[in-house]
Regions:
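Active-site region of glycoside hydrolase catalytic domains
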Residues: 4-11, 15-81, 106, 124-127, ...
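Generic short N-terminal amphipathic or hydrophobic helices
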Residues: 12-13, 472, 486, 515
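Active-site mouth loops of central-metabolism enzymes
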Residues: 82-95
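Glycine-rich ATP phosphate-binding loop
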Residues: 465-480
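Conserved N-lobe beta3->alphaC-helix segment of eukaryotic protein kinase catalytic domains
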Residues: 478-498
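Intrinsically disordered, low-complexity segments enriched in serine/proline and basic residues
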Residues: 506-517, 521-529
């Protein structure tokens, strides 16, 4: 989950001080979703699944690929990863992409969102330093395999795995030098793949990369926005007319509810939205930062020139939104006696909590930060419609993780009831938002496969329980993958325009044959049984 990159640090802090209960999400019947199916969405609405290169591909040292910052980080600081793992093999999509596409086809999905590994096609990060033809060939093969199976590729250009060479050369997104290098990298992708790729996402979750991945979040976000705008300008000038594609950016956001009816807590909730969502949406729509950020951050917030503002305004055909959870927001009063160094999180003057008056905002998933609040996605969509002139939107990530319970049989574990409930309720509220005029054009479940989840690694080991977030179980220790029966049938039937019975989704039972895939990790040679 991309959001885990942002909230992982907070989760670690929470888990260090509070015992984490090994209870899974308990579905609650809040709304009648029994009539929800594919026809509940507009004609042409896209359903798909998502992934990212470092979390999926593996083959870290194959095919001429250069090192990314995540290769360096996981090897140099393995103690920072909960299971001390890395993405060297990941779920081996580099070798097994045909198998994965076959699963997508079985699920009757329309599209697949994946990211290109910048260092796989530009090992040194710069076009002038050499293009890796093997990397180009891999993505051509993946794109062609998707199209041959009736799946639409949605391609993200940057999903956290920056070339280490650029980090070493000028500190990555903390330098304005990256703007031209990103533009050149994007142009290479447009040239090589744009005849078949019609949906481009420049950057995934700039908020996450800025606040957790760098030491100077305001500078990093500034350069990410300008790199995005430069790539969009180039695409629109040189490629969009002939290639007939669209381009946008993906932003992550939590929905924030006021902790109380106090006006200060209501202001805190709005301020939290400004600092997480408005930080990027305001420049993209108005060419400037939210006033709350300007007032609280002051001179530490880089200013856009008039030329930059003009380039930023409207630099998207669509906005991708990654939504997982919601939180209560309480005001933190200003203190004149605070002489400590300012930080992004302190600048907000907001205390975020998932509990109010002893009651959680919703059932908790496996991750300490992920509390299930489906209505939040509707509220966020309506907020975006009202505040930002109703842009075209794709839900580019939405999903949950849950604990593996070692007491369950394989058949019971594959039922995946809670994830079905999570998806169904979020789809219900998305459908409701569409009926209220929000222009949502597609939905991508996170994730196709259990995968390397950044600081959580492949598993979150808590009392010998492991968390999973994919529609396919990927067991690294046993080197196998298994389709989760009920969730696979749910997706397959839903996408066929089927209904899931007359009662709540939590009462549905299906029996799907289990597909087991084994990988010889020593040789990375996949076998499908």
């Amino acid at each position: 989950m991309g959001m885990a990159f942002y909230l992982g640090v907070l989760a670690l802090i929470i888990s260090s001080y509070f015992p984490i209960m090994a209870s899974t999400v308990t579905p609650t019947t809040l709304v009648d979703t029994s009539s929800l199916n594919r026809s509940s969405f507009p004609k042409g609405f896209i359903f798909g699944t998502g992934s990212s290169s470092y979390q999926y591909e593996g083959a870290a040292n194959e095919g001429g690929r250069g090192q990314s910052i995540w290769d360096n980080y996981t090897h140099k600081y393995s103690d920072k990863i909960l299971d001390r793992s890395n993405g060297d093999v990941a779920v081996d999509q580099y070798h097994r992409y045909k198998d994965d596409v076959a699963i997508m086809k079985y699920m009757n999905t329309d599209a697949y969102r994946f990211s290109i590994s910048w260092p796989r096609i530009l090992p040194k990060g710069k076009v002038s330093a050499g293009i890796n033809k093997e990397g180009i060939k891999y993505y051509n093969n993946l794109i062609n395999e998707l199209l041959d199976n009736g799946l639409v590729p949605f391609v993200t250009l940057f999903h956290f795995d920056l070339p280490q060479a650029l980090q070493d050369k000028y500190n990555g997104f903390l330098s304005s030098d990256i703007i031209n290098d990103f533009r050149d990298y994007a142009e290479l992708c447009f040239k090589e793949f744009g005849d078949r790729v019609k949906h481009w996402i420049t950057i995934n979750e700039p908020h996450s990369h800025s606040t957790i991945g760098t030491e100077a979040p305001y500078i990093a976000s500034y350069n990410q926005l300008l790199a995005h705008a430069a790539a969009v300008k180039l695409y629109r000038t040189n490629y969009q007319v002939s290639q007939k594609g669209s381009i946008g950016i993906t932003l992550n956001c939590i929905w924030f509810l006021p902790f109380s009816n106090d006006i200060l807590d209501h202001q805190a909730a709005h301020r939290a939205l400004d600092f997480m969502f408005g930080w990027f949406m305001e420049p993209l729509t108005k060419g400037k930062y939210p006033q709350s950020m300007v007032s609280l951050v002051g001179k530490r917030l880089p200013k856009f020139t008039k030329k930059q503002s003009k380039m930023l305004i409207g630099s998207f055909d669509f906005i991708g939104i990654n939504y997982y959870t919601s939180s209560f927001a309480a005001n933190i009063p200003h203190s004149k006696n605070d002489t400590s160094k300012p930080t992004y999180f302190k600048d907000t003057h907001v205390n975020l909590t998932t509990e109010r008056n002893g009651a959680p905002i919703g059932p908790r998933a496996a991750s300490p930060w992920l509390y299930v609040y489906p209505r939040g996605i509707r509220e966020l969509l309506l907020y975006t419609k009202t505040k930002y002139n109703n842009p075209l939107i794709y839900i580019t990530e939405n999903g949950m993780d849950e604990f593996n319970d070692p007491t369950l049989s394989l058949e019971e574990a594959l039922m995946d009831t809670y994830r079905i409930d999570y998806f169904y309720r979020h789809l219900y509220y998305i459908s409701s938002a569409i009926k209220h005029g929000v222009k949502v054009k597609g939905y991508f479940a996170w994730s196709l496969l259990d995968n390397f989840e950044w600081s959580a690694g492949y598993t979150l080991e808590i009392k010998r329980l492991k968390r999973r977030c994919g529609t396919v179980i990927a067991t690294k220790v046993l080197n196998q993958m298994e389709l989760k029966g009920d969730i696979m049938r749910f997706l397959s039937e839903f996408h066929r325009n089927g209904r899931l019975g007359k009662g709540p989704v939590t009462n549905v039972e299906y029996n799907v044959p289990t597909l087991i895939r084994y990988v010889n990790v020593a040789t990375n040679v996949p076998t499908l049984y």
